[in-house]
């Protein structure tokens, strides 16, 4: 696949097309990042990509499934039960798939190869900058969620190793704040400082194995529950329509693979919108099966008593669940640096454009700036993770932001793409597509505003 970069308007901002680190970071971990010549990267070039249709399905599924899986049983509880949770996901799936197809269409029309480049080219500079800022904030919040997940799983594993009863206070070295900090400084920080990402394939493998294993464990534990596990109240209907919307952040966070989808589309052997529609439909159906299996079985196992992280609801002594916790920790340890690289790349691009300095002119200070950016990012995410009690509070905020990537930006791209057409007489299909774009933007803005306001309101009352 062709080398990509974060900012596309090089002539205006004085940036070179050889953007070094930033040229590779906002791709899916599974996408080939080897640079090619301009001829090979062009639409008429002999090689449009190396990813097969089946491979693209796997990559999109891998990009979709992740840490949000742990919060789906709690989302079913919030939504008001199994029926409401299923209906909500099925309804959302139509918009999620259409957003992925719209991005591919706009990528093909604009000849851009990353999410933010497509938004920048189709919607203009202001929307492009907002998109980059949103990506930076989203990756920052996801990094916080990753550290909280590490602490959650370590608490359970340490309790078993130290043979401490649930909730009992142990020695200082088993304290949650200490164990999260130690793990972060020993493993995450060293992986985050380097300029290159050399462990992407391992992160992808661990993420896939861990996700499927967690799903299998949750389903098996529902079919053959342990005697000491008793479910709480099983809700059958939502308390209010607002309760259903409160489950939206988890679903948006879980299904958000749109940012990495554009590079995947351009890495395909046949990057055609029709083929891509089949790819994302198959991928989303697979992801839906995994999320629904985990959400339904986890919710029915524990009912309204389910934790925001479903693995915390299981006994510490359960060895099968302990293996799942170990998988999740390993997956998150390698996923945090990748998300951090993405966020750091966007911050770096925004900073250089603000300064009006090209990469080549500022290469002497690149390492010092990279280390400083990494340390500030790492310390802020760690500090917030130490004092935020569970991943549900983080997902409630960044899940609303994920709605912007799923609804708002694709909707704006569709509207702008259709408005740019020079037809004097607009056919009915033109009006339908523009109206659908308006619907996407309106729905996404509502979800973002409602969920973010609700998250802030709940946290202020807590």
Swiss-Prot record:
It comes from the Eukaryota. GO terms for cellular component: axon; lysosomal membrane; neuronal cell body. This is Sodium-coupled neutral amino acid transporter 7. GO terms for biological process: asparagine transport; glutamine transport; sodium ion transport. Belongs to the amino acid/polyamine transporter 2 family. The chain crosses the membrane at residues 56-76, 82-102, 130-150, 178-198, 205-225, 239-259, 282-302, 319-339, 371-391, 395-415, 428-448. It is found in: Lysosome membrane; Cell projection, Axon. Pfam families: Aa_trans. The keyword RNA-binding does not apply. The modification Phosphoserine is found at residue 28. Symporter that selectively cotransports sodium ions and amino acids, such as L-glutamine and L-asparagine from the lysosome into the cytoplasm and may participates in mTORC1 activation. The transport activity requires an acidic lysosomal lumen. InterPro entries: AA_transpt_TM. One of its GO terms (molecular function) is L-glutamine:sodium symporter activity. The lineage of its organism: Eukaryota, Metazoa, Chordata, Craniata, Vertebrata. It catalyses: L-asparagine(in) + Na(+)(in) = L-asparagine(out) + Na(+)(out); L-glutamine(in) + Na(+)(in) = L-glutamine(out) + Na(+)(out).
